[in-house]
A protein has these predicted regions:
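Charged, gly/pro-rich active-site loop segments
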Residues: 1-13, 84-151
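Short, basic/aromatic recognition patches
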Residues: 2-30
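Short gly/pro-enriched beta-turn/loop segments at secondary-structure junctions
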Residues: 25-28, 41-43, 116-118, 125
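Short beta-strand segments
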Residues: 27-61, 68, 74-80, 88-90
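A generic "binding-loop/recognition-motif" signal
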Residues: 61-64, 126
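Short acidic (Asp/Glu) patches
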Residues: 61-62, 71-77, 102-113
Length: 151
């Protein structure tokens, strides 16, 4: 599992811009893609957060939660502003966090109140893509990072 901190050490500029884009609207909001039980993709809006240098999400009982509990694979893509259409995406696997102390620290830093119905997952950062461009520029200038060179 690759934490946000490990990703940030390996690719500091991509991580810095990625964090900026995740938090561009204040709270870290993005689109989460998961893999359904039948293998088809599913996409959902979600709040995420980088807390203690790890990427987390709290999930209520839902299709996205079931997908992550059953399969774990995910992709996360930031929202885009048409006036400044930079983009950032990561993909990897979600891991359920059972440690009560970690859950309490993450909940304290979260943008909304969570209770016991929420499942906490850490999102491993195994691949990241940053696309930078002005509103009138095409194509974007992409930078990529992967935990393995073949990705």
């Amino acid at each position: 599992m690759v934490s946000w901190a490990e990703f940030e050490t390996a690719a500091p500029e991509i991580a810095k811009e990625g964090r900026r884009l995740l938090y561009a609207r204040g709270d870290a909001e993005a689109l989460l893609a998961t893999v359904r039980g039948d293998g088809l993709p599913r996409i959902h809006p979600i709040n995420v957060g980088v807390v203690d240098d790890r990427l987390y999400a709290f999930l209520l009982p839902s299709a996205k939660r079931s997908d992550l509990e059953q399969d774990g694979r995910y992709a996360l893509h930031t929202h885009q502003d048409p006036a400044a259409p930079d983009e950032f995406s990561v993909r990897g696997r979600a891991h359920v966090v059972d440690d009560g102390a970690i859950r309490a620290r993450v909940a304290d830093a979260w943008s909304f109140e969570v209770d016991d119905t929420y499942l906490l997952v850490e999102l491993s950062v195994e691949h990241a893509v940053l696309g930078l461009r002005g509103a009138d520029e095409w194509p974007p200038r992409y930078r990529r990072w992967s935990k393995t060179p073949s990705d």
